[in-house]
């Protein structure tokens, strides 16, 4: 990221910079936008937020991809109401970026199988092979057990389940809200979806 290059950006230049940073975050584990916060709506408890990992960005289609366990509460929430928002924050730049849109949940098809083929032989695959669903209560002895021990048990119990509970979340961005917190003066810009892309406007911070 380079804040100095945005000393006086046009909306077009700013929009291009934001997408470039998002694309970079999907490739760079150290990027501050690699782990945004995903907010969904739960009919029973209202807004729900959690940290996720940004996996892929397709600038041309304004699409961001995330992975999750299909049994996660957020999947049911998104199936009931696909509206969602990602919140990215960069402490180094003082930039906040909110990305709103609708999320499509996929548990079957090429979107899922092609990505699982790349993931299945990595350590991260164990996140989706557990016989226990995310959030399920467990005994204190299980909570205290070393992660390696649990992973080995889960691997043995679930080796029969190819692709298991792996799901892909595809967010189509409909709005981007950028805020720069700067001692010299805050700045804010909002970009809304149009057929040809995102149209932007400057706003009061």
Label for each model-derived stretch:
Residues 1-205:
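Binding-site signature for planar aromatic cofactors or substrates
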């Amino acid at each position: 990221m380079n804040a100095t290059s945005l000393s006086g950006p046009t909306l077009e230049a700013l929009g291009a910079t934001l997408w470039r940073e998002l694309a970079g975050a999907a490739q760079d584990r150290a990027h501050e936008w690699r782990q945004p916060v995903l907010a969904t709506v739960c009919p029973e408890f209202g807004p729900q937020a959690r940290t996720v990992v940004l996996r892929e960005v397709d600038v041309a289609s304004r699409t961001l991809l995330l992975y999750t366990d299909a049994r996660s509460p957020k999947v049911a929430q998104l199936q009931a109401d696909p509206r969602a928002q990602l919140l990215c924050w960069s402490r180094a730049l003082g930039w906040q970026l909110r990305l709103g849109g609708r999320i499509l949940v996929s548990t079957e098809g090429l979107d899922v199988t092609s990505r699982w083929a790349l993931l299945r032989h990595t350590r991260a695959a164990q996140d989706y092979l557990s016989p226990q669903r995310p959030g399920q209560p467990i005994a204190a002895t299980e909570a205290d057990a070393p992660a390696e021990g649990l992973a080995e048990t889960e691997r043995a119990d679930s080796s029969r389940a190819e692709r298991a509970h792996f799901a892909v979340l595809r967010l189509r961005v409909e709005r981007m809200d950028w805020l720069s917190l700067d001692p010299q003066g805050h700045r804010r810009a909002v970009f809304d979806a149009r057929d040809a892309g995102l149209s932007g406007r400057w706003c009061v911070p």
